[in-house]
Amino acid sequence: MQYGYFDEKAREYVITNPNTPAPWANYLGSPDYGAIVTQNAGGYSFVKSGAAGRILRYTFNQFDEPGRYIYLRDEETGDFWSASWKPVAKPLDTFKTETRHGTSYTEIVSEYDGIRSKALYYVPMGATHEVWRISVENLTDRPRKIGVFGYAELTTESFYTQDLVNMQYTQFITKTEFHDNFILEQINEFNYPNPDGTTGRERFFGLAGAKVASYTGRREQFLGRNRFDKPQAVLDGKCDDSLNYNGNPCGALQFTLELGAGEKKEAAFLLGQKTVFEAKKIMDRYADLSATVDSELQELIRYWHGELENLKICTPDKNFDAMINTWNAFQCFTTFVWSRAASLIYCGERNGYGYRDTVQDIQGIMHLDPELARKQLTFMLSAQVHHGAGLPLVKYSHNAGHENTPDDDSYVKETGHPSYRADDALWLFPTVYKYVAETGNTAYLDEEIPFADKDTGTVREHLKRAINFSMTHLGPHGMPAGLHADWNDCLVLGSQGESTFVAFQLYYALNIMKEFCENEPEYVKYLDETAEKLLKILNEKCFEGDRFIRGFRDTGDIIGSKNDREASMWLNPQSWAVISRGATPEQAEVILQTAYEKLNTPYGLELMQPSYRYDYFEGARMRLFNPGTKENGGIFCQPQGWAILAEALVGHGNRAFQYFRESSPASFNDDADRRVIEPYVHGQFIEGHESPFAGRSHVHWLTGTASTVMVGCVEGILGLRPTTKGIEISPAIPAEWDGFTMEKVFRGKKLHITVNNLAHKEGKPEKYILNGQEMPAGVIPEEMLAEDNKIVVIM
């Protein structure tokens, strides 16, 4: 069933049926103030941290509530409804609604009983408060009197676990006050710092554009003994002007609109963590409500559409266009900002950045905003320990040069991460390379950056120490040890077990460093010898003719042998053998074909097969999951991006695009009940063929899938591959395509690219025509590019 459609011109996803299989969400705000809102106005808000800065309460794993609720009441009849379908949930044959999720804003338009409402939710650029503008229009030919209620359920404590669990304490530290047109909540804790370093917490919920007629700061008074669909205050037609003192706080404000026939009026609810003086200043800002809100919304749209304009494509597949031009890109920015911190699935327990997650997330925006990417990349380099490993969790309060590490009990106790992971620092190599290649800024390699615990070094030195960490943590076969994890958090191989996946990552890193250190002949010689030795081990110990094994247990037993009854075929070693250029052309063809035959489904490639049921070992923690789920034979979506890239690198355009289409959210827009989560954002995994719910996706928005699929599509399918010398354009596309166009900004220069595929090839173009001059396909040196360029790629 279809619940909505892509409006690519507006860069919006439009939900026409609000009764979706799961809450379909959008993200608002910035790193300083974040908000999640669904098509039914569910969701929550937080300052800096979803764990330690929670403002709005949200109850996870239930029915998408509470949220940002606006209720409308006909004062003549007493009938009432909500501006979004839920929480009141009027019958959809009489209640018409449409939700437009845009780039950092959401608007819900509804009609009921001759009244049209528009609820616009957004966080202004650079602000740390949110706006809920509500406009109400009388569509009838008679006067109407409409009561409007805004409801925000405030947390009793910024740490969400304290708010939801430690109620014997938190319900007795909060109280509310009413000031001129706003409710103020006070939390009497001054001994714990806020995420921004201040102490004490005050929140406000205010009304601009209308006069408050009644209010309450007590949840129990607003709801009564009912639920959100029938609040007692709305039934009564007003709040009782009571305030909270020991209990559950809320902000509830009511006002009345008198509308003539065809008349429209508007107001706005405002929410933030502010003192009374700051709240008054914000309230004054909206004295000219309509002009201010319109200006702020347009500023948001200009910013985000400007960010997305740095790459624009037009292909024969409109779902592909919608994902690459808008939704995959916007999701990449969202994961870049919030990592895995706060969603409707990630409850906010992680109070920081996962190292591997964030370094990979940076790659997803590199082609759109490389300088923003650089800022976060520099931050993550400063979270690298002096011996080369990355901190598994980088705290929001990270203080480079002064951090504890997994070698310290205090770090383990605070973060829950007991050891280093084999892959963390190796993700720096593709990410640093992508930055240098996208910008041409080789001087970045000489920038001095502190390490997390002690010492400083250039970016180049940071990378050298990452290689050294891998080389000093080798297993019995001379391959990198798997340590506490090797990207797959369910594969714990320790100091003696070895990872083929990480070995190919290391091989990739060694070859990148040869380019970065070309003026250091002795070090380049070491890199060459090390890479040659490692590749020899991989071919002699890990290649079984049609596949690379997954690695070795600490007992020396093989993981992922073709002779194994379970877990005999794994995806990532095959993809990374190709991406790292470790596989020969002949090997690449064979191993990719084996992956296709053994792992592919209508919904994407399964991570490994057959799933573990009986033959697992102690380090194979994926056995905890049901077969066909997550790392145990599920379609883990992040590796789909690597598979897309691998197929594209060998010129398999048909299969690269097949893999994109099979797991793409947009492919399920007409079959949304199967996929369940949003058809405009990637999920973490899809249930595999062993599940009775094959094709169902989970863990929306905050996932590394966003960046890997973006890279796979941009560098692989579209073939846009910046190098340190210039840019290569080598598409790998469906042979049936006649061609497509792209517009890209590269090092400040505009590229207008037309791909001509009248020969109906899958990949490997024959030649380019650059500004009227023919040249062989390959890298276009930067010095050959004008400020504005027309490039024709002949396949």
Per-region residue spans from a language model:
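Catalytic cores of carbohydrate-active enzymes
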Residues: 149-151, 166, 391-392, 505-622, ...
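Short strand-turn-strand beta-turns centered on an Asx-Gly dipeptide
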Residues: 769-773
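Inter-helical turn/loop segments and adjacent helix faces that build the functional surface
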Residues: 137-143, 276-280, 438-452, 510-527, ...
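Aromatic-rich carbohydrate-recognition surfaces in CAZymes
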Residues: 71, 353-358, 362-373, 377-477, ...
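Surface beta-strand/loop "capping" patches
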Residues: 722-753
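Anionic coordination/interaction segments
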Residues: 1-356, 370-379, 383, 434-439, ...
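Active-site acid/base region of carbohydrate-active enzymes
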Residues: 84, 93-96, 315-326, 371, ...
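Carbohydrate-binding/catalytic loop surfaces
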Residues: 343-352, 393-421, 452-458, 477-499, ...
